[in-house]
Amino acid sequence: MITRREAVRLLGSVSAGVWFAATQSGLNLSFAANASASNYDSTPALAPGTPTSPERMALIEAFKRQSEGLQDKFEARTYKGDWVMPYRLFRPATTGKVPLVMYLHGSGGLGDDNLKQLRFGNIFGTRVWLLPENQKRFPCYVLAPQTDRGWIRYDFSQSPAKELPGFGDGARLALEIVDGLRREFAVDERRIYVTGNSMGGAGVWNMLANRPHFFAAAVTCCAGESSDDGTGSVETPVWDFHGDADQVVPVSSSRDRIAARRKAGGHPIYTEYPGVDHDGTTGLAFTEPALPKWVFAQHRS
């Protein structure tokens, strides 16, 4: 079994890891490396152990211990656009130009308290970038906006609400915040990244479709269903995660998007966790030791 010390070490470095491959429903999920100019479609090694093994759970518990108190490092701010959007911002201890990572919360973060987008399942996607070892190697701004009406467009006259095509108002306002931060701080504009979980994952796909050639890379976890088919900004590196036991967002939504993106000429990375449900995917994805190194290796030309 992995030791506590080893779990902590793995959170800040790329481990030897293991390779995971699966084939389901006719979609090849094998993660063979396919070198390219940017090397973004070469699958990094995953964390040791199976998704539900004691080794993997130790890694998640180590992350929770390490990330305690990091919420307090986020500054509370608000943006006034078509409506008021609260957001949290972490500023790194550096004066040079550094990347910016934006995290879009899932439905559990809905509201206007400027807090829930940092708590519960959102701790992984917001705090991983703040871990001391990650800030030492990859200093960056971290933006966590909060919406009370979703990232994509919905028809709320229907029950349940129906997803609509087009640029989501929540996604658009969040990008206006990014544009403002680019003017206010020394942000490396070639290295702006977007990540999201569940409803936030749908927001990521919406941004890729409606703000092409803007992001250096994207990370999605069990992304919610939407009209965005995954082919937007097809040249942008994407690492997509999903659990095949997800009862909230069917795993077929990720499989279909990834298949469409590959057909359109993209080279996304797709990691599917066997036996993992909706809530379990985010912790596994954002504690993959190779994730920070992969993200920050991507940049726009």
Question: For the regions a protein language model found, what residue spans apply to each?
Answer:
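Gly/Ser-rich "nucleophile elbow"/oxyanion-hole loop immediately N-terminal to the catalytic nucleophile
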Residues: 156-197
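Active-site machinery of serine-nucleophile hydrolases
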Residues: 109-171
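Primarily recognizes the serine-hydrolase "nucleophile elbow" in alpha/beta-hydrolase
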Residues: 190-233
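Short, proline-enriched alpha-helix->beta-strand connector loops that line the catalytic pocket
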Residues: 138, 233-238
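C-terminal catalytic histidine-bearing segment of alpha/beta-hydrolase fold enzymes
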Residues: 237, 241, 247-301
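The conserved beta1-alpha1 loop
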Residues: 104-105, 242
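A domain-start/cap signature at the N-terminus of enzymes
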Residues: 2, 8-19, 27-100, 202, ...
